[in-house]
Structures are given as structure tokens and as C-alpha cells.
């Protein structure tokens, strides 16, 4: 199977794992992350962190914020380079209970995910997710 076709199949499974994450189950997503120590994650709940142990801990803590959810995806960019690196840039459209709330809340994340061919498959080596999906004034980066 060509690297691009194989990656398409992995993206489909990764999206299903993120759907599980929105329901409070971190295990399928954790399986996608690299076991190497150069793995990194940045999400809306915590600062950037790296290292397999710390990334898994952040996933386990982050998932506690979600239940009863689902995620839709808008692919913006997808590429595979030299057969060993791949990138997704997409909008994730979440509908989930957040932070113990009783109502399902919709929100969108802007996400960049880097994958590396590793151990006979594709593993996430970096994921950055944030809620910035519209233009903001320059002053918005200045802390109050």
C-alpha cells in the first residue's frame, strides 16, 4: 500500500480515537502517540510539554474535561513527505460536555498534528490544538 493510502487509513482511525476522547476515553488516542521521548503536545488546557510520560499524563488529565461527545473534521491540509513524515492541519468540530457541564457544548479547535513512520505504523509526534479559528486583533496576544 502506498504511504499516502496507508496514511489516509490511519487518519480515519485517529479520528475515531478522537471521537472516543470526546466521550472521556483516552486509551485509543494514547495508542497513536509515539513512545519516543521527542513526542510533544500543546492543548488549550496546558502549556506545551514533551516526553512520552508527560504527554500521556496530559492526555489523561485533559480527557477528564470531556464526556458524551463527538468530533467532526474539516481537513485543511494533509501531506506525506518521503514516506516517513506526515502532517494534518484541520479544524476539529467538537460537541461534548465540557468541564462537568450538563449541556453538550459545540466548539472548534484549530489543530496541527505531525506523524512519523515508527514501528511499522504512523505515530503522533506533535499535536497543537487551540480555539483560534477567526482573526483577532494584535493586542489579543498581550496578557491583561
What annotation goes with each model-predicted range?
Residues 35-37:
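Short, conserved active-site loops that position catalytic residues or coordinate cofactors/metal ions
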Residues 1-28, 40-144:
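A beta-strand edge to alpha-helix "cap/lid" segment located at domain peripheries
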Amino acid at each position: 500500500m502506498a504511504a499516502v493510502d496507508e496514511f489516509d487509513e490511519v487518519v480515519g482511525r485517529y479520528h475515531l480515537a478522537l471521537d472516543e476522547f470526546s466521550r472521556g476515553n483516552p486509551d485509543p488516542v494514547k495508542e497513536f502517540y509515539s513512545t519516543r521521548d521527542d513526542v510533544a503536545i500543546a492543548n488549550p488546557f496546558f502549556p506545551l510539554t514533551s516526553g512520552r510520560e508527560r504527554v500521556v499524563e496530559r492526555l489523561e488529565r485533559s480527557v477528564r474535561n470531556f464526556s458524551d461527545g463527538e468530533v467532526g473534521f474539516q481537513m485543511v491540509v494533509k501531506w506525506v513527505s518521503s514516506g516517513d513524515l506526515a502532517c494534518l492541519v484541520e479544524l476539529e468540530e467538537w460537541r461534548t460536555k465540557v468541564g462537568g457541564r450538563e449541556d453538550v457544548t459545540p466548539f472548534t479547535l484549530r489543530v496541527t498534528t505531525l506523524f512519523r513512520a515508527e514501528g511499522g505504523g504512523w505515530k503522533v509526534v506533535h499535536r497543537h490544538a487551540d480555539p483560534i479559528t477567526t482573526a483577532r486583533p494584535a493586542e489579543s496576544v498581550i496578557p491583561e
